Amino acid sequence: MRKEITREWDFELYFKPDCPFCLKVLNYFRENNIIKYPSYNIEDDTSGYENQDKLFEAGGKVQVPCMVIDGKAMYESDDIIAYAKENFLEKAKENKAKREESK
């Protein structure tokens, strides 16, 4: 079952916890304050493979890591990180500042 979170980002990340490429992306996001986004562990899918099915619908394969943004699937950890560097870092800094102000 998908849990609702307060979103700061308009993407979803599909991963497996034992996948080194997934961990590379997850660690990069955490280290750069890219947090509060929907992420789905496709191995811990108590909803009857719903996450795997949605991943397949997005990109035509069940491969992780996969970031789905604007309805398009992006695979490969290096590509995801490069996209994040280009598109997310400034917003991540702004979001972090907002969170710190609200404390």
Model-derived segments and spans:
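A short, hydrophobic beta-strand/beta-hairpin element that forms part of a small beta-sheet core
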Residues: Q63-A73
